[in-house]
Amino acid sequence: MAFLALGINHKTASVDVRERVAFTPEQLVDALQQLCRLTSSREAAILSTCNRSELYIEQDHLSADAVLQWLADYHRLSLDELRASAYVHEEHDAVKHMMRVASGLDSLVLGEPQILGQMKSAYAVAREAGTVGPLLGRLFQATFSAAKQVRTDTAIGENPVSVAFAAVSLAKQIFADLGRSQALLIGAGETITLVARHLHEQGVRRIVVANRTLERASILAEQFGAHAVLLADIPQELANSDIVISSTASQLPILGKGAVESALKQRRHKPIFMVDIAVPRDIETEVGELDDVYLYTVDDLHDVVAENLKSRQGAAQAAEELVTVGAEDFMLRLRELAAVDVLKAYRQQSERLRDEELQKAQRLLANGGNPEDVLAQLARGLTNKLLHAPSVQLKKLSAEGRVDALAMAQELFALNEGSTDKSPQ
C-alpha cells in the first residue's frame, strides 16, 4: 500500500493554469473511474476548488509519473507544462499534506474553514464513484479528525483575516443578534459580495444592495435573497438600516453627514454601525462625529486583520504540531494494519492444529484412555505441531547465515538471552 497526494494550487500555479486543471462537478465521477482504470491506482479522490486541484491516491506501488501523465492528458496539457506547477507528496508526506489542507494550513486565507467542507465533498463524490476503499477511507476519516482537533484545540479559525469578514465580525460585536438587523450594502464588487455572503451566513434579517447600476445590484442581491436599489435610493433605506457597509470606486463621498443625521432622527437615535471600506472614502469623515454612529474605515479594519493574522500565525504553529502528530499516528496504525492479515492466517492455522489434536484426544478418551496420559499427549502434540513450521524455517535461515532473521525471531517470540531454565547448583 502506498499513498500519493499531487496537484497544483494558488502557490504553484497561475489562475490560467488552475482554470485549465480544474474539474467541474459533472466531470468528477467519470474522471475518478477513468483515473483508477488507466493508472495503477486502486483508490482515488479529487479535490477541485478555485485555489487548488489535488488527487489523493492509494496504489500498490508508487507511480506518480503515470498519474501526472493522466492528469495532463485529461486536461489536454503537455506533461512538461503540468510538471512546472505540480507537486507530489508520497506516503507520510501525503498524509500530512492532506491533514494540512483540511485544517486550512495550506489555504490562501490561513485557517479558512470552507476547505474542510470541500474536502468532505471530495470524499462523498469518491464514494459515489466507487473509488474509495478501506485504506483511503481510513485516511479521510483521520484527516477529518485532525482538522476537527485543530479547530477545537487552537485559535486558528477564531479571528477574521479578510476585510469583509472583519467588518461583519465588528457588526456582531455591536449587535448581539444580527437576525434582528437590517444591512445596507453600497457597491457590488468582490468585497461587498464577500460581505453579503458573511452577513447572509450570519442570518441577517434583511439585506439591501445599492449600486450605481441596478443590474449589477440585482445580480448580487439574487445570490443572497437581498433587495436591489440604486444609489439615489440610499436616503430612504438609511432609516431602516442598522448596518451600513460601503465599498465603491467613487471618487467623491456617497454618504454625507446630513443624510445620516436625518436617518438617525427617523430612527429615534437607534445606533447605526458603518464601515467604509472604500479608498477614496465613500462616507464623509464628519459622520463619525455623530452620536449613535459607529464608523470604521478600511484602515481600522486592516489593523484588526493584521492583529488577527498574527494571532492565527501563532495558532498555526500549534496546529502544525497537531497535524504532525496526527500523520505519525495514522502511519503507525497503518503499519499495524499490515500485520492483521498475517495474524489472522496464523490464528486460523493454529486453531486448525488445535482442533486436530483435540479430536484425537477425544477419540482416545472415548476408547478408555487414561485422562492424564491423553492430556499430556494433547499438550505434546499441539506444541510440536505449532513449533514445526517455525523450527524448519529457523534452521533454514540459520544455514543461510541470516543472523538478522534469527534476531528478529528472538524478538518476535519474546525470548531473552539466558531465559532457558537452569538446574539449581
From Swiss-Prot:
Additional comment: During catalysis, the active site Cys acts as a nucleophile attacking the alpha-carbonyl group of tRNA-bound glutamate with the formation of a thioester intermediate between enzyme and glutamate, and the concomitant release of tRNA(Glu). The thioester intermediate is finally reduced by direct hydride transfer from NADPH, to form the product GSA.
GO biological process terms on file: protoporphyrinogen IX biosynthetic process from glutamate
Entries under Gene3D superfamilies matching the protein: Glutamyl-tRNA reductase, N-terminal domain, NAD(P)-binding Rossmann-like Domain
UniProt-recorded name of the protein: Glutamyl-tRNA reductase
Residues binding NADP(+), per UniProt: 187-192
Reactions this protein catalyses: (S)-4-amino-5-oxopentanoate + tRNA(Glu) + NADP(+) = L-glutamyl-tRNA(Glu) + NADPH + H(+)
Domain notes: Possesses an unusual extended V-shaped dimeric structure with each monomer consisting of three distinct domains arranged along a curved 'spinal' alpha-helix. The N-terminal catalytic domain specifically recognizes the glutamate moiety of the substrate. The second domain is the NADPH-binding domain, and the third C-terminal domain is responsible for dimerization.
Family according to the record: Belongs to the glutamyl-tRNA reductase family.
Subunit structure: Homodimer.
DNA damage found in the keyword field: no
EC class: oxidoreductase
Signal peptide: none
Superkingdom assignment: Bacteria
Binding of substrate, residues: 49-52, 107, 112-114, 118
PANTHER family named among the record's database cross-references: GLUTAMYL-TRNA REDUCTASE
Molecular function GO terms recorded: glutamyl-tRNA reductase activity; NADP binding
Keywords for this protein: NADP, Oxidoreductase, Porphyrin biosynthesis
SUPFAM superfamilies: Glutamyl tRNA-reductase catalytic, N-terminal domain (SSF69742), Glutamyl tRNA-reductase dimerization domain (SSF69075), NAD(P)-binding Rossmann-fold domains (SSF51735)
Pathway: Porphyrin-containing compound metabolism; protoporphyrin-IX biosynthesis; 5-aminolevulinate from L-glutamyl-tRNA(Glu): step 1/2
Gene: hemA
EC numbers on record: 1.2.1.70
Sites annotated Important for activity: 97
